[in-house]
Structure formats: structure tokens, C-alpha cells
């Protein structure tokens, strides 16, 4: 059989398919057109903006016909790897070292317009093989069936880890017939919105997915606030700990272990530093370096008109030509780490936009640790299609070095929860509601360059795996490291140490993987780290600094500290960020002094500022005092103002009166109106939410002093308009007996008892599983994903408004603590019972020092009854009309 090929012509285009969420939508289109849809907004006019005579039909195409609709960047071609009936409804895949493809089939996605039957066990994990070597898969084996909406998989040991939220399974074949006969559970809480034990229904847009074995030997996931690590022995012997919830659908890492992710309208974010560092200081809210938006240009360049997007009737959603204007379904990012495209592509990110039938290539640049993503083809895309049914949902690296595209080939991709009447009409007008059981997998290759043919047998030797750690294709390096760690291949430790310390005699990536493989095996030693700290490559030295932290809690702590401090005097900028992070783990006066010197002798950088602040929990005011008294800092002027402001902000958020009084003393020390004074006061003022006309008054939790701090009166006399303005902003935060206009202390909230205490306890569990992934355990929310709940006027105010927010969701712009958020919260009316909603709301109204009254089940029941006919989410304006 000959591969179906599409050769690139003209402008570069590639279409990628969308998240699993979209399959739910297919069935929705079959419902009666005149009926109001879940995604409709009250009184909203849904006018068709694209003339029907310019909208082409959308017939079902054969793979050969679909291939002819592709326009790919010059020098590339698109080859068919698999198609129905060999594969159905694919949403994710992984290649293995033998060249087989393990594919997730989410065949239960939206079997009817209202999703009826979606919870039936019809999903599969299938294994596809190319038995004749022609590049096209020709053999299908159902490895594991009977799954309910499976999302993704990860190769592990002699089987696979399967994400079937809320369960995470391990399955393997023990008798050699290619079908799983052992299936054991690793976790039963692998989801935020899909847990039958708690009465929640699935929302495919917000279920955990994409478990990824990262460079640091932890397994991270998209849309999930926990990371996992295998402890050896049994395949179910895992530990887990909280982490940042990343993105929505899809997760990838680069050669240095940095994680990349995205969400529908936010095409690319990255963790520039490991997120656990920023979590060290609970008052660093939010720290800069994790979940950083690295692509800010949201425009897309599709190959066809795109009226079939959910808000296509809104001005600005489509261009005047009727094409998609900005991202609305970004998903499935992958950092290209193969060797088939050529070195100039290594480290670039490819991502899907299925509603626009395209794939973007983002060129990644690094300047002093800051990553920036830009479209590699300005005004065009890497791959596009004129076939409206081309829906790539995921992208993957593979052992042959090519780029694989998972195409959920169908017309309907929007979930019925968000479906609008407009989109339903679009679907029905072109017959896009069926079929719903097709699917293709494509391979993008660069012409004129060989495609990798490397393979390993069923039981590769340790020597073979160690050799693969230096392979030019990152897929092989990752796979070899994971397999060595899974085997507990301690016998390979001497080879790994030799590779790690080989300097320029071996590839940088090979040395890096050798170090992390030793860490995963528990065979890393200080001698190896000492050698790595002298490596010619800053990336290796930085990794060695990070790895030294594993010795700080054991008997070799002092020796590890000495190794780190030996590097402190001559660290180039490329390595300095990691040194500052590691010094924050050591936490001694000496390391803080080193951090101060490093900051004062380098260009201002928010990354470095927050790296230091993250390691100063509880000691920010001491560090700030050392800066104010440092003559070098005094000459830095505004370049280091964010550092002083950030430290002051943390002290203010900590709420300790003694530390805040000292902070005010420090603010009064510099010359009146000096930049240091303004920076410190600005940091404090930034913690006080600003009231906005027509919006709920933000909650200000004052800090109570026994008497008026002396520095306050001194600062009020400063002859500076800016200082006077800042003092006025800070004033609501400061309280003391007899202060004019200050209300008397509110009586302490009575401890919850009886039914209320039980409700709070249940709410604690619900929050962890349902809410915490987005709003985070600390309640401070996440940039680009969820606003804060801690001290939120919406949480502590009207329980009638709060009940409606949870029942029906919120859309469009909403102000929280003086900051505007343009984010959509899904409705939970069908997902949670009245008692569960009351429990969760009681928790957030009494956690984090809150003292609002608990919410009763009857309150939610009454709110549900009063809004029984409502099918729309709420806007801020509507909520403000509710007492």
C-alpha cells in the first residue's frame, strides 16, 4: 500500500483537531432547531454574518480526498498513517519503541444530541501496527475495551496507564495475545469534574488528561492539580503531591523539562521554572515564572470561511471575509523534539486549532530565561485544510522523528453544554451532525530528509537504553530514561555516571538525561554532581544545582551546600536563575546575602526577583531591610522597584501587624519621594482592592495594630503627590483603636458545629476535587484560568448570587477584588446536588480566615427552583440585580 500524500503548495497551512470536548457537540446538531440551546444568552441576537452563498458544502471525504485539501509549509508533506475502519474517534496516541501506535478511541463522545449514552462503556485503547513496512498501519488490535470516555494514555512498564476520569488505570497483556487481561487502579480521583462517587457528571472540556512522564521523573497532567511519581515495586505504588493545574487539553515538555500547555482561547503558556518553587511562599500571589503566557498574538490565518464556530455571530469572532479571527479551540500542543525536520525546528511548538482546521507552528525564542512564542509564518499557518471536518485534536512526537496529527474527523466538535442555536443551524445546514465514528492519523514529514527507522525489541538491554539517551530524537531519549527508571536498572549506574561527566564528548541532552536517570534510580551521588557543576554547558550546571537539592534534607546537607556555594561567585546569567532558586531551598543568612549580591549585579528581571522572593517565606521584611540599607540598591532606581514592591506585597498579604509596622518603618527610611519609598508603598497598596462604580464593594481585611504605627504619621507629612496617593490607598488596610472612621471589631465568628461542621467537612473534599484544580488549594486562583475566592466579594457577599453562580455558571467580564476577569465558569447544576453545592459554598465562606455564615441546602434548593427555566449562564450585570 502506498501512503496518501499531500504536498505543500502556496501558503503554509495545517489543520489540527480539537479537544475531546467537541465530540459531544456532534449529536447536539440533530436536536430540533428552534429549541433554545444551552449556550444561548438571554436576549442575544444570533445573526448570521457570513452570506450562505460563499459557504462551501462540507461533504464527507475519503482520506485520499481529505489529503488533497491540505496546504502545508513549503518543503513538507502530509502522509496518511491510519483511517477508519482501522481507527475510530481517535483523541490521543503514543508510539512505542517497536513502532506500534497506541490510540485512545473516545467513541462514546456525544452519541445523541443531548449526550444520552455518553456514559456507556464504548471507548477503547487500540494498538495499530504496520506489518508490511509501507508506512501505513494495517493491523488493529483492541488492547482494552469497555471504557467510558477515555481521554489519554501513557506507556508504562509492559503496559499502559489509561486516563478514564475519574480513574487512572494500569493495564497490561500477560499472555501475549495483544489484549489486556490485567487492569488495576492507580487512582480514583483523577478528575475535577467527573467523579460518579460524588454525583458529578462528565464535562469533557475540564477533565484531567495527558499524563506525561517528565524529565524530573514525575508524571504531570493537563487540567489536573496533582503530580505523580512511581515508587518502584508494584505498578500501583505511586505517590502524589499538589502542583499547578496546567492548561485544558494536551501537555508537552522541551529538552530541558519545561512544560507547555494551553486552553481554548489562550494558545500557549509555559512553566519557565518548576512551579513548586513559586509555591514555597504562600504570600507570593501569583509568582512569575509558572503558567506564563508566551504567545500574546491570538490571531489565526485559516484557509476557508469558518461560520461554524460557536460565537460566529458575534462581532470580531470572524474576519470580514468570514474566517476565524482569533483562537477559540487551541489544544494539543507539542514541543517538536524530533530529528526529521532539522535542527532549526527543534524546540518549536506546534498546536491545534480544530475549529479553524489548522495547525500552528510557534517559533520559541529565549532571552534571559524569558520564552516568547511567535508565529513562524506571519499571516499564514504551518498547515491548513479546506475540509471543515478536519479536526486534529492532538499532536505527538514519535520514534521516526516526524510529527503525528490525531484527526477526530467529524463535523460537530462543540460540547452541548456550550452549544448555541446559531451553531446548531450551521451544523444542520451542511449535514455536519454525522457521521461521528470516523478518524484519521496523519504524519507530517520534511521532504528530502530521511525518516527514522530505529526500533527496539520487546526487551531491550540496558546498554541499548543508555545509548538511546544521546539520540538526536527527544522521543528516544525520554523513552530510554523512563524505561531505565521503570526497570530500576541500577546496574547501568556506572555507564550513566560516565555519560553525565563526559563534557563535550557527548551530546548535552545525553548528559542531561543521564543525570536525571540517575536521580530516578536513586543512584545520583555528590561526586557526579560535582563533575556536572564543572560542565562546560550552563544547562547542565543548572540541572546539577537543581539536583543538589535532593541532598539538603539528609546527612550530606553540608557537603551539598558547599558544592552550591562554590558556584555562587562566578555564575553566568544562563545559570543564575537556577542558582537563586536553589539558594532559596538552603535558606540561611549567607545564601540570602549571596542572592542579594547576585540581584544587585544583574539586570532587573522579574523571573529572578520572584525566584528569590519564593524562597523567603516569612523573612521578606528582613531581606527588604537589607536592600534598603544597601548603597548599591539605592543607585539602581526604578529597575529594581518591582523587587522591593514584591517583597512589600508579600509582607502585607501575610497580615502580621509587627512585620507590617516594620515594613512601614522601612518605607519611611528613604528620602521623601524616593523611588524605594514609592516602591514599598506601592507594593502594600497593591494588596488593597480598588472599588469600581456599580460593582460590589471589595472585601478589605484590615490589619489591626495596638496603636497607630509611628511611620504612618511620618509618611503623611511627605511632600509628594505620589506618596500621598499611595498612603490614601493603604489607609483602609490599617486599623487601630480609636482610628477615625474605623468600625469596631466584628465579633469573632462562632465555630461551626453539628450539621454545619459536617457540611464544611464534606465541602473540604468537594473543593479539593471539584474546585481546587482551577481556584487552587490556597484560594488565590490562577492567572488566565480562575479568579481568586479568598477574600472575594462574591464569596463573602450575597449567598443568593453565589448560589446562582454555581448553579448556572458565569460568562463574560466579571470584577473580583478590583480586577477584571474575562473567563467562563461552567454550570454545575446538573453535576452537583443541592447539598453538595451548599457544602462547597460553606467551605469557601469559612476557609482562609473567612467568617461568612454557612450556606444551607434549602437555600440552594430555593435558588434552583426560582431559576428552573434558566438555560443561560449569568453576567455580572444580572447578578448585581439579585439582592
What function would you assign to each model-found segment?
Residues 41-57, 746-758, 816-823, 827-883:
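Flexible coil segments in periplasmic/lumen-exposed cytochrome c-class electron-transfer proteins
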Residues 37-465, 475-476, 483-485:
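Beta-propeller domains with acidic blade repeats across secreted/periplasmic ectodomains
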Residues 446-447, 775-781, 807, 811, ...:
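Detector for the c-type heme attachment site
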Amino acid at each position: 500500500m502506498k501512503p496518501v500524500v499531500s504536498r505543500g503548495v502556496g501558503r503554509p497551512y495545517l489543520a489540527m483537531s480539537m479537544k475531546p470536548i467537541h465530540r459531544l457537540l456532534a449529536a447536539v446538531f440533530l436536536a430540533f432547531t428552534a429549541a433554545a440551546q444551552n449556550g444561548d444568552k438571554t436576549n442575544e441576537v444570533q445573526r448570521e454574518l457570513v452570506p450562505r452563498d460563499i459557504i462551501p458544502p462540507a461533504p464527507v471525504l475519503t482520506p485520499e480526498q481529505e489529503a488533497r485539501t491540505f496546504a502545508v509549509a513549503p518543503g513538507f508533506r502530509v502522509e496518511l498513517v491510519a483511517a477508519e475502519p482501522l481507527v475510530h474517534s481517535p483523541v490521543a496516541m503514543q508510539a512505542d519503541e517497536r513502532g506500534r501506535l497506541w490510540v485512545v478511541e473516545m467513541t462514546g463522545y456525544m452519541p445523541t444530541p443531548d449526550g444520552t449514552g455518553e456514559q456507556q462503556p464504548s471507548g477503547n485503547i487500540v494498538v495499530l501496527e504496520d506489518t508490511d513496512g509501507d508506512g501505513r498501519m494495517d493491523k488493529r488490535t483492541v488492547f482494552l475495551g469497555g471504557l467510558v470516555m477515555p481521554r489519554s494514555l501513557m506507556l508504562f512498564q509492559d503496559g499502559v496507564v489509561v486516563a478514564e476520569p475519574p480513574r487512572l488505570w494500569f493495564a497490561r497483556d500477560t499472555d501475549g495475545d495483544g489484549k489486556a487481561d490485567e487492569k488495576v487502579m492507580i487512582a480514583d480521583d483523577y478528575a475535577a469534574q467527573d467523579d460518579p462517587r460524588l454525583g458529578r457528571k462528565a464535562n469533557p472540556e475540564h477533565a484531567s488528561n495527558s499524563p506525561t512522564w517528565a524529565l524530573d521523573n514525575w508524571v504531570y497532567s493537563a487540567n489536573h492539580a496533582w503530580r505523580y511519581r512511581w515508587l518502584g515495586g508494584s505498578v500501583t505504588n505511586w505517590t502524589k503531591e499538589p502542583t499547578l493545574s496546567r492548561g485544558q487539553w494536551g501537555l508537552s515538555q522541551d529538552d530541558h523539562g519545561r512544560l507547555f500547555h494551553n486552553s481554548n482561547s489562550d494558545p500557549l503558556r509555559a512553566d519557565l521554572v518548576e512551579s513548586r518553587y513559586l509555591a514555597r511562599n504562600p504570600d507570593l500571589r501569583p509568582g512569575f515564572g509558572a503558567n506564563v503566557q508566551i504567545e500574546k498574538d491570538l490571531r489565526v490565518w485559516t484557509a476557508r470561511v469558518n461560520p461554524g464556530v460557536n460565537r460566529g455571530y458575534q462581532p470580531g469572532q470572524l474576519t470580514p471575509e468570514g474566517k476565524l479571527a482569533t483562537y477559540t479551540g487551541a489544544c494539543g500542543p507539542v514541543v517538536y523534539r524530533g530529528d526529521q525536520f532539522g535542527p532549526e525546528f527543534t524546540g518549536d511548538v506546534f498546536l491545534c486549532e480544530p475549529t479553524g482546521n489548522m495547525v500552528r507552528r510557534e517559533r520559541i525564542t529565549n532571552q534571559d530565561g524569558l520564552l516568547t512564542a511567535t508565529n513562524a509564518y506571519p499571516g499564514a499557518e504551518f498547515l491548513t485544510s479546506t475540509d471543515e471536518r478536519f479536526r486534529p485534536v492532538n499532536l505527538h512526537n514519535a520514534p521516526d522523528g516526524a510529527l503525528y496529527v490525531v484527526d477526530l474527523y467529524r463535523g460537530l466538535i462543540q460540547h452541548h453544554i456550550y452549544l448555541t442555536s446559531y451553531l446548531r443551524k450551521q451544523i444542520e445546514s451542511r449535514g455536519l451532525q454525522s457521521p461521528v465514528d470516523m478518524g484519521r492519523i496523519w504524519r507530517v514529514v520534511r521532504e528530502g530528509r530521511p525518516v527514522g527507522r530505529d526500533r527496539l525489541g520487546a526487551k531491550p538491554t540496558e546498554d541499548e537504553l543508555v545509548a538511546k539517551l544521546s539520540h538526536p530524537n527527544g522521543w528516544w531519549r525520554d523513552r530510554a530514561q523512563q524505561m531505565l527508571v521503570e526497570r530500576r536498572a541500577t546496574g547501568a549506574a556506572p555507564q550513566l555516571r560516565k555519560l553525565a561527566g563526559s563534557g563535550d564528548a557527548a551530546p548535552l541532552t545525553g548528559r542531561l538525561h543521564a543525570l536525571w536517570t540517575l536521580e530516578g534510580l536513586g543512584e545520583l551521588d555528590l561526586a557526579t554532581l560535582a563533575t556536572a557543576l564543572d560542565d562546560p554547558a550552563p544547562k547542565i550546571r543548572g540541572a546539577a544545582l537543581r539536583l543538589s537539592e535532593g541532598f539538603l534534607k539528609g546527612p550530606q546537607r553540608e557537603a551539598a551546600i558547599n558544592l552550591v556555594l562554590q558556584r555562587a561567585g562566578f555564575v553566568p546569567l544562563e545559570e543564575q536563575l537556577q542558582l537563586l532558586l536553589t539558594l532559596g531551598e538552603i535558606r540561611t543568612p549567607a545564601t540570602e546575602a549571596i542572592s542579594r549580591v547576585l540581584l544587585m549585579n544583574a539586570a532587573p528581571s522579574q523571573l529572578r526577583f520572584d525566584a528569590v522572593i519564593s524562597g523567603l517565606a516569612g523573612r521578606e521584611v528582613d531581606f527588604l531591610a537589607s536592600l534598603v540599607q544597601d548603597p548599591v540598591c539605592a543607585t539602581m532606581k526604578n529597575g529594581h522597584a518591582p523587587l522591593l514592591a514584591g517583597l512589600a506585597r508579600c509582607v502585607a498579604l501575610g497580615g502580621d501587624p509587627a512585620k507590617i509596622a516594620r515594613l512601614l518603618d522601612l518605607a519611611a527610611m528613604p528620602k521623601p519621594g524616593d523611588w524605594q519609598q514609592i516602591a514599598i508603598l506601592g507594593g502594600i497598596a497593591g494588596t488593597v482592592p480598588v472599588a469600581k462604580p456599580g460593582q460590589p464593594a471589595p472585601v478589605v481585611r484590615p490589619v489591626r495594630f495596638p496603636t497607630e504605627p509611628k511611620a504612618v504619621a511620618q509618611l503623611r507629612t511627605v511632600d509628594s503627590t505620589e506618596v500621598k496617593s499611595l498612603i490614601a490607598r493603604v489607609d483602609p488596610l490599617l486599623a487601630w483603636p480609636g482610628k477615625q472612621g474605623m468600625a469596631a471589631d466584628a465579633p469573632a465568628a462562632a465555630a461551626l458545629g453539628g450539621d454545619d461542621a459536617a457540611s464544611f467537612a464534606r465541602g473540604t473534599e468537594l473543593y479539593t476535587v471539584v474546585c481546587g484544580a482551577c481556584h487552587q488549594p490556597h484560594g488565590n486562583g490562577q492567572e488566565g484560568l480562575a479568579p481568586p475566592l479568598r477574600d472575594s466579594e462574591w464569596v463573602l457577599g450575597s449567598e443568593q448570587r453565589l448560589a446562582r453562580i454555581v448553579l448556572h455558571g458565569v460568562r463574560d467580564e466579571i470584577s473580583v477584588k478590583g480586577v477584571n476577569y474575562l473567563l467562563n465558569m461552567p454550570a454545575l447544576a446538573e453535576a452537583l446536588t443541592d447539598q453538595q453545592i451548599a457544602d462547597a459554598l460553606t467551605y469557601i465562606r469559612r476557609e482562609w480566615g473567612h467568617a461568612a455564615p454557612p450556606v444551607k441546602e434549602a437555600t440552594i434548593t430555593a435558588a434552583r427552583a426560582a431559576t428552573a427555566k434558566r438555560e443561560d449562564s449569568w453576567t455580572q450585570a444580572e447578578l448585581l440585580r439579585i439582592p
